[in-house]
Amino acid sequence: EDMPKLIAIDLQPMAPIEGITTIQGDMTSMAKVEEILAHFTDGRKADLVISDGAPDVTGLHDMDEFMQAQLILAGLTVCTHILADGGTYVAKIFRGKDCALLYSQLKLFFKQVTCAKPKSSRNSSIEAFVVCQEYSPPEGFEPDDLSRVLHERAKGMLQEDAHGNALGTMGWPT
């Protein structure tokens, strides 16, 4: 009982590792999320969730950054169900010119959100890790509210031009 619960999920098959539950599949799939959650029905919570998943890159940086952000939010979905108060979430991120919305959304749930780039990573690489510490969801938050809460944060960050047209966080028309 005192042993940590370790669960790994990957699209590719994994060799079995003693003491680790492995799940093959896509963590953006609701069926796989439910499979992960089934391992936490005993009331225990995770202290740490790590995601180093990345989409197949297209070479279109804006698209790659968007797809990576969706993986981070899929991980956040899992966190809202299983992460203990004060817990940590670490995820691979593609640092782009406009990460403000994603950081803002993560800061709704974590007291500290920082970006860390390992020294071993090439300087030219946009790959880094977002480190989210001290999980503390908004008061009254229920995991099923996640989409609504993230959407409201996104709406709050949108600006309007002089004609009332919505502008993205970079000031471009949406």
Regions found by a protein language model. Give the residues of each.
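S-adenosyl-L-methionine
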Residues: 2-57
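Aromatic/acidic cage segments in peptide-binding pockets
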Residues: 4, 26-27, 65, 69-70, ...
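Eukaryote-biased feature marking scaffold/signaling PDZ-domain proteins and nuclear chromatin regulators
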Residues: 4, 17, 31, 44, ...
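Short, ordered loop/turn segments at secondary-structure junctions
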Residues: 11-12, 27, 53-54, 88, ...
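Intrinsically disordered, low-complexity regions enriched in proline, serine, glycine
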Residues: 17-19, 34, 91-93, 101-103, ...
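Conserved S-adenosyl-L-methionine
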Residues: 110-122
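SAM/dcSAM-binding transferase cores
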Residues: 128-174
